[in-house]
């Protein structure tokens, strides 16, 4: 967006004269923006403090590199709405169908050929700077000084795949709207065809090497993605011609529709919250004990934890949006909770699993965004927990002061009342 803003300013700078009315409008807009941002920072002060006070990612420092797979995942991202068995979370590889790096290379070739007349430079140069910086950051990485100055140090390199793809799409859209017949990229038809074929093979090779086995076991997918790639790149190389512009648009429209319309709803209806026995029992307990129904889930996954939350329970270990420092201090103790190796586990956004133990109070990083807390029955009492949903029997953890009383046991889901 900054690159687009620079282009708009440069394009209209000489043609537009600013008068007093314009200055007043600009000042009003600036004041309005300052006011909106001030309100946001004031109201979000506590949340921002929690976020920036966390080692991960509040004190994250990224320098990029080794993230080539998400750059080229657009080659097979059209398959994500359909059945893919080799990847559990396709959104981690989601990206825009951008034909990267072809739009960027076409723009570079055009700049070199038109260095004297500087036609279209106002748009192409800012957009290319953004594209190149993002590409270098993702593929090779940068030093700490550049990461700090560019404000990329808080950005995981994989998360740049979408804005990088968006920059390529903006280049394509600009070329579609502004390149004329005289804006020739390559004169030789033979060079265009050979370049299209070689670049398609190179892109497909990289995609196959980094695709987490999405394409390898499905030859038909390779053919489909390869044909889209070859056809699309050839039209981009000839984007100065009206007939090729139309062909590119006619390719992208059905691809966009087929990749969007086929996405199934995550859940239809709310019967999962109204008809399931464990949900009904949870809601019954919540309605009878509105003030003290503090829960945890033991030996479950984050989906069960959040399911309990959706059923109306006050649950400690649902997916946390902010770091719960009080929880960690209670379970681990003041000193241990502040150790660097322990703080590294903390996360602004985290799925929290819990497991009651006989004598261990500890925390473990399972993977990014997911941690596990081990706690004794004494810590359960300190936290004020009254109800536990679990998949195992907890009577073995009874103590002289704490007793787990079973309230519900059906289909592998068990609810306990904690008496102390």
Q: How should each PLM-predicted stretch be described?
A:
Residues 1-11, 32-46, 89-98, 257-265:
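Transmembrane helices and adjacent periplasmic/lumenal helix-loop junctions
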Residues 4-11, 106-110, 128-132, 161-182, ...:
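Transmembrane alpha-helices and membrane-interface helical segments
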Residues 14-29, 118-123, 185-194, 217-222, ...:
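Membrane-interfacial entry segments at the cytosolic side of transmembrane helices
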Residues 30-34, 91-130, 298-302, 311, ...:
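P-loop NTPase catalytic cores that bind/hydrolyze ATP
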Residues 37-123:
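Periplasmic/ER-lumenal interhelical loops and adjacent helix-loop junctions
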Residues 117-123, 132-191, 202-225:
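Membrane-helix boundary/interfacial segments in multi-pass membrane proteins
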Residues 124, 262-420:
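Soluble catalytic regions of membrane-associated enzymes that act on cell-envelope
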Residues 199-215, 235, 250-271:
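Transmembrane alpha-helical segments
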